[in-house]
């Protein structure tokens, strides 16, 4: 039954776009705790985690309904988040729910060991009975509590899993033949991972369909979201998840792109060197999430995290937070954000004071101030039509099956650190080309390739799950597109049991079917350039990993792409540089690349406020070095400089009032943090009162920009500011 449902969902060619009319939530965060003054970051909404909290919580657990009330009483919109693959579900595993033990439903590796998320918290094989439990004991309860937005996070099946009795039963139901050990052949690996992917697609469909139906009985329009890592990260971490196929589910209203330092610091190869490239990886991860959902019109939140799961030092957190934060803002079509996960961990946790020290401390005041300036900028960050600087129109094709070939490994196939993907992306990204990704599963959607001039693709590391995609690719080339196919097609996954070699099809490779659609009928296409209709395709018989695992070995790909881009793409010259810039309203973003065409810094000039400096200085000129990023407020672009306004602040501004020569507001932010604000005024203040005390200081007034720098201790109760000039 699952197989029939999954196939029907995968073959849907149209998507249900969910209008977010009147949606009041632009910023959100997740917390398993009740409201506390130390974590009151003033986003629009809070996703209260788990009816039983977070399994890793060590403190006393407050009942779910009490946690909800505590946040509502402070003015927050309350949503719900829990894990679909793991969670505080001991009542299910130990038999308290239905009288039967279910620990045997955990994901199991080849050694027979259960894969645990925490104590008594296994990663789950999502059986029908487990889904019944999730619906009855969790989804129903939160809807009864009046919550109309449900976030089911991280539908994850480990690639190394696949040996439990529960999984073997699901295999038999899905494929109709007995389970096969995935480590014994590439085909078994592919089939095993394909099933894992289908199981969680089905799980989310079941749970969300129930949530919407039950909500209707209560007169509620329940929205359902999936917080998920990117396809790139799951592939690198050897985890299988539904990813792009979630777009085929009408019951999914949106997503959270779970990208942060922890995912983006996974090393990759470039120019023969494997190392962390946090900014570049984050840029590609956010891009994969945007392209996965853009054709659907559904809501997408981008996540950043000021720290990460792995314990490191505060300086490391700050540097990489700035890199990921800048990367997310370089997507001007996305303007909704999860500003942080687990504020209780960020504000109250203890982390190293330096990389060489074992001494730990809570978040330094300078970093909490900077972080709050950054997250409060997200409350005002506009969606814009502006473009990231650089030559546009180069895209890389992705498919969900990228996750299927990662593990177990087999003779004849090696893809170190996902090099077959990064081999197509990094040679361009490192030269300042803002490459995009396109998802094979979305090709049926109108305009999926509208912004693509040259499409790079490879079946070395992934395979097409349906033949229909090839018709869309062929039609796109026929109408003038340029396709570069880059693969030897010699990997052992070419011959796995799939549509291209079953049901009467006898293609040795899936690419044979694609090239046949474009007029080649001689089996394995030879390297070279071919014309089809108004377009061109080029077959390059190299696996993309060769361009990055070896030093100075990407020139052939670069030259070929440049030649076709300029001759056939109708896009002018392919520009190489060592930076990206973007303008979003009054905000300026700059990222300068290392390992690029130049080591020159990028110079900015103007009247700027540096948001990555907790002192919010006025900057008139700055050189940004390679491997550095910056975010500025450009005062020169403020539309109405006679209007008093807070341009940057480490608190959220409420109740603004401006009459004549007076401006007042209330600032709110967590206790035990320091606020700094730069305020634009028509004239120099004569009086500046903070909570009934005169605090004006001549030294804090900048005559040229007509801005005042104000500092005080934050309070979640609100600090009242009254200015006269």
Where are these regions (language model features)?
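A conserved amphipathic helix/loop scaffold
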Residues: 463-660, 668, 677-679
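The substrate-binding groove and active-site-proximal loops of carbohydrate-active enzymes
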Residues: 47-59, 115-135, 185-203, 228-230, ...
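Hydrophobic targeting/anchoring helices
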Residues: 36-44, 49-50, 153, 215, ...
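Catalytic domains of carbohydrate-active enzymes, especially glycoside hydrolases
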Residues: 24-66, 70, 74, 140-149, ...
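Glycine-rich, aromatic-flanked loop segments that form ligand/cofactor-binding clefts
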Residues: 63-117, 148-159, 211, 215-226
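Active-site-adjacent "subsite" loops/lids of carbohydrate-active enzymes
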Residues: 80, 84-145, 179-197, 205-206
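Aromatic- and acidic-residue-enriched segments that line the glycan-binding/catalytic groove
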Residues: 87-116, 153-184, 239, 413-414, ...
């Amino acid at each position: 039954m699952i197989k029939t449902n999954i196939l029907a969902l995968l073959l849907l060619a149209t998507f249900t776009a969910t209008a977010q009319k009147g949606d009041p939530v632009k910023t959100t965060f997740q917390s398993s705790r009740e409201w506390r003054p130390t974590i009151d970051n003033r986003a629009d909404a809070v996703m209260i985690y788990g009816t039983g909290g977070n399994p890793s919580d060590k403190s006393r657990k407050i009942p779910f309904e009490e946690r909800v009330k505590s946040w509502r009483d402070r003015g927050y919109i309350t949503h719900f988040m829990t894990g679909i693959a793991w969670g505080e579900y001991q009542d299910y595993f130990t038999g308290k729910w239905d009288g039967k033990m279910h620990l045997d439903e955990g994901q199991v590796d080849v050694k027979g060991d259960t894969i645990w998320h925490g104590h008594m918290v296994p990663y789950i094989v999502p059986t029908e009975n487990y889904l019944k439990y999730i619906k009855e004991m969790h989804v129903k309860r939160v809807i009864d509590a009046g919550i109309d937005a449900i976030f089911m996070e991280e539908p994850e099946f480990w690639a190394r899993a696949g040996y439990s009795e529960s999984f073997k039963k699901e295999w038999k139901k899905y494929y109709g033949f007995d389970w096969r050990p995935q480590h014994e052949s590439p085909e078994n690996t592919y089939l095993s991972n394909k099933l894992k992917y289908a199981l969680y697609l089905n799980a989310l469909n079941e749970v969300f369909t129930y949530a919407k139906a039950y909500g209707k009985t209560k007169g509620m329009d329940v929205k359902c979201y999936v917080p998920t890592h990117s396809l790139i990260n799951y592939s690198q971490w050897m985890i299988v998840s539904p990813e792009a196929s979630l777009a085929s589910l009408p019951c999914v209203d949106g997503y959270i792109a779970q990208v942060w330092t922890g995912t983006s610091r996974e090393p990759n190869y470039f120019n023969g060197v494997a190392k962390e490239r946090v900014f570049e990886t984050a840029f590609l991860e956010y891009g994969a999430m945007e392209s996965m959902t853009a054709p659907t019109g559904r809501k997408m939140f981008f996540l950043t995290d000021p720290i990460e799961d792995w314990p490191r030092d505060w300086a490391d957190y700050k540097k990489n937070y700035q890199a990921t934060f800048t990367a997310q803002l370089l997507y001007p079509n996305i303007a909704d954000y999860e500003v942080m996960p687990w504020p209780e961990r960020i504000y109250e946790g203890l982390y190293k004071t330096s990389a060489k020290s074992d001494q730990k401390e809570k978040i330094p005041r300078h970093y909490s101030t900077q972080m709050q300036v950054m997250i409060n900028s997200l409350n005002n960050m506009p969606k814009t039509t502006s473009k990231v600087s650089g030559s546009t129109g180069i895209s890389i094709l992705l498919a969900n099956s990228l996750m299927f070939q990662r593990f177990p490994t087999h003779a004849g196939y090696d893809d170190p650190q996902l090099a077959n993907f990064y081999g197509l992306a990094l040679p361009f990204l490192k030269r300042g080309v803002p490459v995009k990704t396109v998802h094979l599963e979305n090709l049926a959607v109108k305009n999926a390739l509208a912004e693509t001039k040259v499409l790079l693709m490879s079946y070395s590391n992934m395979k097409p799950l349906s033949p229909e995609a090839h018709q869309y690719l062929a039609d796109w080339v026929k109408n003038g597109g340029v396709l570069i196919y880059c693969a030897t097609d010699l990997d052992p996954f070419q011959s796995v049991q799939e549509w291209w070699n079953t049901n009467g099809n006898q293609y040795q490779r899936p690419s044979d079917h694609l090239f046949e659609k474009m007029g080649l009928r001689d089996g394995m296409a030879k390297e070279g350039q071919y014309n089809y209709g108004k377009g061109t395709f080029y077959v390059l018989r190299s696996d993309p990993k060769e361009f990055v695992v070896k030093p100075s070995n990407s020139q052939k790909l670069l030259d070929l792409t440049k030649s076709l881009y300029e001759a056939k793409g109708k896009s002018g010259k392919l520009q190489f540089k060592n930076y990206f810039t973007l303008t979003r309203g009054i905000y300026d973003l700059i990222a300068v690349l290392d390992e690029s065409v130049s080591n020159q810094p990028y110079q900015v000039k103007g009247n700027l406020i540096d948001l990555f400096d907790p002192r919010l200085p006025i900057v008139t000129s700055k050189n940004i070095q390679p491997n550095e990023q910056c975010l500025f407020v450009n005062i020169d672009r403020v539309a109405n400089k006679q209007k008093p306004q807070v341009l940057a602040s480490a608190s959220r501004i409420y109740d603004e009032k401006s009459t004549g020569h007076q401006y007042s507001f209330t600032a709110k932010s967590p206790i035990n943090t320091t606020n700094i604000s730069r305020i634009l005024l028509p004239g120099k203040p004569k009086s500046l009162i903070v909570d009934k005390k005169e605090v004006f200081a001549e030294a804090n007034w900048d005559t040229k920009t007509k801005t005042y720098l104000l500092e005080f201790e934050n309070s979640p109760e609100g600090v009242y500011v009254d200015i006269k000039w």
